[in-house]
């Protein structure tokens, strides 16, 4: 009994569609997807736009300390209705004015310096947010790439295992015809081939699904079949928590709280400005040519009492500082714990992979011996199938362990 021709035709088409030679021009590596993800991310574009917009605020602050020139104009004509109308002592009979005023804040070096410092710190915070967003995006893309690559490894293994079973089919058929093996042994092989065909198809479906997920994450509109190259993720050996982006954020937050306190102090600092104006200010239109003039002077403002709002603002900043310290201390403890966890998992996974390789090597030698002995009719064919099943389990464990190792390396590399 043989497999139906339609099944083998379908198998041939499937294997051809997955042929590495056919897809040699469609190989892609991790860098391709990382670059595409960074270029297409609307979140990164938005963060970069916010950073550029905040840089413009420094120019706005600088302009605010330069002379401010304004112009005002007013024409007021109160009609005389006999016994009714506004009192002329109040309205002066009308108002006709047009004045240009220039005002300059004096002794503004300190306020300007503090505001520039605050904007600089905000720029640093935004730049750090961009860096953290890039790290998160790269980590997510790499994790999905590893998942898809693991699926591809599973496809390759299932194809190779299918070839092993198919290679035994002609020899076993001849041995069955010669009475060395039973017809049930041949049927058992065919069932194993059918099972492996289904496993291969499921692996292909899973690979394509995870490849689509990778394209979605990177903003790539592409339906073509590609071969993913093995990701090269270096083993990060140096970890300095003080240089981590998250710890830098805590430091910037501390400096911003200090700058906020200085801004509060500036609000209560006396302010002095000089002004000058020129124009026309008349109550009678006929006197406008004679009412052209100018004036100048000083403006002084100082807060005397505001209900102790300054102290309340100080208390609010103090609460924010305490909260910042709590988050920083928790992050520091969490960082070290996470680092130890990942390093322990990596060591354990490396040991597991080494053990699985030894097991697979032994199973491969046994499988080769079975092939020779089957050809001579020296072993039960069911024992060969059991060995193939055991070999399959070990290879699946190896694929999963290697996937876990790559994921751990990804976690370590982008630990923040």
Show the residue positions of the predicted features.
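Periplasmic alpha-helical coiled-coil/stalk elements that build and connect Gram-negative outer-membrane
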Residues: 134-248, 345, 349, 391
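Bacterial N-terminal signal peptides that target proteins for export
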Residues: 1-11
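Amphipathic alpha-helical coiled-coil segments
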Residues: 46-61, 133, 137-156, 174, ...
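Acidic, low-complexity, intrinsically disordered peripheral segments
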Residues: 23, 31-32, 397-416
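Bacterial Sec-pathway N-terminal export signals of envelope proteins
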Residues: 22-68, 180-183, 218-260, 343, ...
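Bacterial N-terminal signal peptides
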Residues: 9-19
